From Swiss-Prot:
Component of the large ribosomal subunit (LSU). Mature yeast ribosomes consist of a small (40S) and a large (60S) subunit. The 40S small subunit contains 1 molecule of ribosomal RNA (18S rRNA) and at least 33 different proteins. The large 60S subunit contains 3 rRNA molecules (25S, 5.8S and 5S rRNA) and at least 46 different proteins. CDD domains: KOW_RPL27. Belongs to the eukaryotic ribosomal protein eL27 family. GO terms for biological process: cytoplasmic translation. The keyword Magnesium does not apply. This is Large ribosomal subunit protein eL27B. There are 2 genes for eL27 in S.pombe. The keyword DNA-binding does not apply. One of its GO terms (cellular component) is cytosolic large ribosomal subunit. The gene is rpl2702. PANTHER family: 60S RIBOSOMAL PROTEIN L27. Component of the ribosome, a large ribonucleoprotein complex responsible for the synthesis of proteins in the cell. The small ribosomal subunit (SSU) binds messenger RNAs (mRNAs) and translates the encoded message by selecting cognate aminoacyl-transfer RNA (tRNA) molecules. The large subunit (LSU) contains the ribosomal catalytic site termed the peptidyl transferase center (PTC), which catalyzes the formation of peptide bonds, thereby polymerizing the amino acids delivered by tRNAs into a polypeptide chain. Keywords: Cytoplasm, Ribonucleoprotein, Ribosomal protein.
Length: 136
């Protein structure tokens, strides 16, 4: 059987606090681990999407509206719905691992790095679909 949930794949969260949010898979664990005895993925997603920007807005207002609030989480495969999209995040692959979640300072540092990476991606204009909220 072909593995669908691979690193770099964009998925939607279907259950829980972040239901309906878009995430990108950073690392997948098919067999499970001691702390999570089921197939799961370490994901980074967008908790708060950037707001709409128009030409008439000033630079300061555009900068405020272009902020992205990320989250990192370990999610069961059953709660992820894969999409056809992929997102290239080479600098995040080794940064967020299952051990990152044990230490709060590591977690916040990882979130800051994810935030910077997401904002860079958003500023370039590529992967625009990832940074728009899902309408349903």
């Amino acid at each position: 059987m072909v593995k669908i949930l691979k690193p770099g794949k964009v998925a939607l969260v279907t259950r829980g606090r972040f239901a309906g949010k878009k995430v990108v898979i950073l690392q997948n664990v098919d067999q499970g681990s001691k702390s999570h005895p089921f197939g799961h993925a370490v994901v980074a997603g967008v908790e708060r999407y950037p707001l709409k920007v128009t030409k008439s807005m000033g630079a300061k207002r555009i900068a405020k509206r272009s902020r992205v609030k990320p989250f990192i989480k370990v999610i069961n495969y059953n709660h992820l719905m894969p999409t056809r999209y992929a997102l290239e995040l080479d600098n995040l692959k080794g940064l967020v691992t299952p051990t990152t979640f044990s230490e709060p300072s590591q977690r916040s540092a990882a979130k800051k790095t994810v935030k910077n990476t997401f904002e860079e991606k958003y500023q370039t204009g590529k992967s625009a679909w990832f940074f728009t909220p899902l309408r349903f």
